[in-house]
């Protein structure tokens, strides 16, 4: 237990450091570039640098598949992922620190040389951060085969990530002002920004090392793959999966909207309100609100469904933009508007994340093959493209409004304020309206639709393997659970009652522990963990299905201790379910056990009478003779 806790806390520390770094890179570095890197009025160099940053960030997207493939091929004594997490974390942190300098003043004396060096260092930083980020988030399946432990680790990571992303906003102004030689500028001076970057770099390095020392990768042949991912494949999957495509479009516009407004908030508090400390107060509130908001997602999604929750999130964000836009010089009203805008963001992100995850099965049903890694890679791709473009918008807005080196709230003209407010409030509002319009018209992959798809995939698998010959003259099947024995024709589902997925038996479960009835291989495991297919050495395929309609629960109340491709021993616990969760959802908890390719046998018989109470691993069903 202590080892698991250390692993969770270490991974949470890694998530904290990862988001501290990303928040600095994606939001605050552009503020440094526009307000401190060059002399007042040097708009040309600022424009060149921001365009260079945008080009590098978009170009780096082309390298992402190569980065993923390099990580997949890594073999070391420390595992597959940790070398990249630790090494990438150290190198990217040091490179980021260097970017918060003027390289000895050559940005003024030798601008062309500076641009070349800046581009090289930025590219190194961006590539190694991508190695670290990709390796870090890909680690979760490698830390445990237990789905419950993975979920706990993910929860710890979400907490660390939320705190990291928001804490930067809390401390950035106090840190910069504390270390600045001059306090005249609301955003400090170069010295203050350097010490802020130094702290970020130290956090990035220490948390990366913490992940390396505190986590342990579970060696599994299941994750070994020689298949290479290419950007062409990603776009091919998008073209074949209309739900993924339209959701990606909606999410791209959504990301442009929220990223642009979020990145402009420090400018707003510094140059419109003239109170940069108000920004720290805002992110202090955001830190706690973000943790609370995300915790309500399961209950809100269950009550309203995900699509309606997304609409509600956009409505509240638009309300927040409206309040924010009329706040004028009021700090209190600005904070109210900013919070209305922020509160729904974690919820909307989780809606998108869940639908993208469900799009894996949608694409599988539509194309006949499963593209999980490619499908899940779409969100980071959209995030990077949207983040690069929103950063570019921010730099143009800052230049146009005059919020550059030497500017203060008193030097911003009325025209500059008007341009800034239009860009900060009107542009994101339009982006959100476009996003919700696409979502409403094109995205129909609800929880109910996904549950239907999961059941259809299970039926397809059974029908496609029904005629697979078993290399055995007879087969005796033990019960995987304890409970009361039933005939299949007593099951309230025609697919099972009519033996469309093979002959077998059913049980009213006495508890939620599910054991492997024989030694074999996990051929299929539903993402919702409510069904599993095992195959023994003779090619006999057995389906264990927990409850009726339980795919709707989307994994809630179900735990898996194995994954597809796992080798299991007879009597090994493979699944567990919490019966009250099924009954609370008013669903049938009957456990169905069928031999998918039972048609290859001539005869079947029950070894125990119907209604008999059986213990897990008792022999209850036999097939013999060859058809």
Curated annotation (Swiss-Prot):
Keyword NADP assigned: no
Range of residues in the leader sequence: none
UniProt entry tagged with the keyword Transmembrane helix: yes
EC number(s) stated in the UniProt entry for this protein: 2.7.1.-
A Pfam family per the record: MFS_2
GO MF term list: kinase activity; symporter activity
Locations listed in the record: Cell membrane
Positions of the PTS EIIA type-1 domain: 493-597
Keywords linked to the UniProt accession: Cell membrane, Kinase, Membrane, Phosphoprotein, Sugar transport, Symport, Transferase, Transmembrane, Transmembrane helix, Transport
Record field: transmembrane: 13-33, 46-66, 84-104, 111-131, 159-179, 193-213, 244-264, 281-301, 309-329, 336-356, 392-412, 419-439
GO biological process: phosphoenolpyruvate-dependent sugar phosphotransferase system; sodium ion transport
Predominant location category: membrane
Coiled coil: none
Protein origin, superkingdom: Bacteria
Modified-residue entries (Phosphohistidine), positions: 545
Gene Ontology CC entries for this record: plasma membrane
Enzyme class: transferase
Annotated region (Permease), positions in chain: 1-460
Family statement: In the N-terminal section; belongs to the sodium:galactoside symporter (TC 2.A.2) family.
Free-text comment about domains: The PTS EIIA type-1 domain may serve a regulatory function, through its phosphorylation activity.
UniProt protein name: Lactose permease
Organism in which the protein naturally occurs: Lactobacillus delbrueckii subsp. bulgaricus (strain ATCC 11842 / DSM 20081 / BCRC 10696 / JCM 1002 / NBRC 13953 / NCIMB 11778 / NCTC 12712 / WDCM 00102 / Lb 14)
Lineage, highest ranks first: Bacteria, Bacillati, Bacillota, Bacilli, Lactobacillales
Encoding gene (name): lacY
